[in-house]
From Swiss-Prot:
The intra-membrane loop at the C-terminus acts as a calcium pore, mediating calcium leak from the ER into the cytosol. Residues 207-227 dip into the membrane without crossing it. GO terms for molecular function: calcium channel activity; endoribonuclease inhibitor activity; enzyme binding; ubiquitin protein ligase binding. Endoplasmic reticulum (ER)-resident protein that confers cellular protection as an anti-apoptotic protein by limiting multiple stress-inducing pathways surrounding the endoplasmic reticulum and mitochondria. Inhibits the activities of the key sensor for the endoplasmic reticulum unfolded protein response IRE1alpha/ERN1 both directly and by blocking BAX/BAK binding. Modulates ER calcium homeostasis by acting as a calcium-leak channel. Negatively regulates autophagy and autophagosome formation, especially during periods of nutrient deprivation, and reduces cell survival during starvation. Residues 51-52, 108-112, 161-166 are lumenal. The gene is TMBIM6. Changing residue 209 to A: Abolishes calcium flux properties. Highly abundant in testis. The lineage of its organism: Eukaryota, Metazoa, Chordata, Craniata, Vertebrata. It comes from Homo sapiens (Human). It comes from the Eukaryota. This is Bax inhibitor 1.
């Protein structure tokens, strides 16, 4: 039999029999909201780079934090759904604005870094998401404690590096942080499934978890590529 004559059963590939239909519908809403966030964040980054709207990174970070707290404090219901979607869009927009300075830095180093970092992040996110979806339920939830501990250590080392100013420690934080955030994609995806299976239908808040995972992976990968490119330019001189 010629292997090239075989037909691929895409329905079988996309069949998640271990996930209930209601949870699958919930995941569709989560990823639809995630796509909306990506579009709005891209618009926010573009607006910053063209108009330098809200130039101070602190203001955009503070604004996104306020919107996140507001969203968290607003209960999920049919009556508040439109309001919470608006808050989600505002949060995504300001997050995109906050990415502006990092994007400008990478463009100054090498404009090709941006599409490379985005495509790399998309591939990483897709692969780890599919791994979490196809894996046995709760198989990655044990990572929660490990990931939170690693995140705490990264935060402490980042604060310590403010005083030490070590480039080696900064680079180590980038690489280790990238690995940790890949783990969070696995953990958060399976946690969302478990929450949905137990009746938590707040797809807007679940979307924020995945959106922040994607943005953090993108930011770290972008900075790693930019630093590597700068090192290459130094070696050529």
């Amino acid at each position: 039999m010629n292997i090239f004559d075989r037909k691929i059963n895409f329905d079988a590939l996309l069949k998640f029999s271990h996930i209930t239909p209601s949870t699958q519908q919930h995941l569709k809403k989560v990823y639809a909201s995630f796509a909306l966030c990506m579009f709005v964040a891209a618009a926010g980054a573009y607006v910053h780079m063209v108009t330098h709207f809200i130039q101070a990174g602190l203001l955009s970070a503070l604004g996104s934090l306020i919107l996140m707290i507001w969203l968290m404090a607003t209960p999920h219901s049919h009556e508040t759904e439109q309001k919470r979607l608006g808050l989600l869009a505002g949060f995504a927009f300001l997050t995109g604005v906050g990415l502006g300075p990092a994007l400008e830095f990478c463009i100054a180093v090498n404009p090709s870094i941006l599409p490379t970092a985005f495509m790399g992040t998309a591939m990483i996110f897709t692969c780890f998401t599919l791994s979490a979806l196809y894996a046995r339920r709760r198989s990655y939830l044990f990572l929660g404690g490990i990931l939170m501990s690693a995140l705490s250590l990264l935060l402490l080392s980042s604060l310590g590096n403010v005083f030490f100013g070590s480039i080696w420690l900064f680079q180590a934080n980038l690489y280790v942080g990238l690995v940790v955030m890949c783990g969070f994609v696995l953990f958060d995806t399976q946690l969302i499934i478990e929450k949905a299976e137990h009746g938590d239908q707040d797809y807007i808040w679940h979307c924020i978890d995945l959106f922040l995972d994607f943005i953090t992976v993108f930011r770290k990968l972008m900075m790693i590529l930019a630093m590597n490119e700068k090192d290459k330019k130094k070696e050529k001189k």
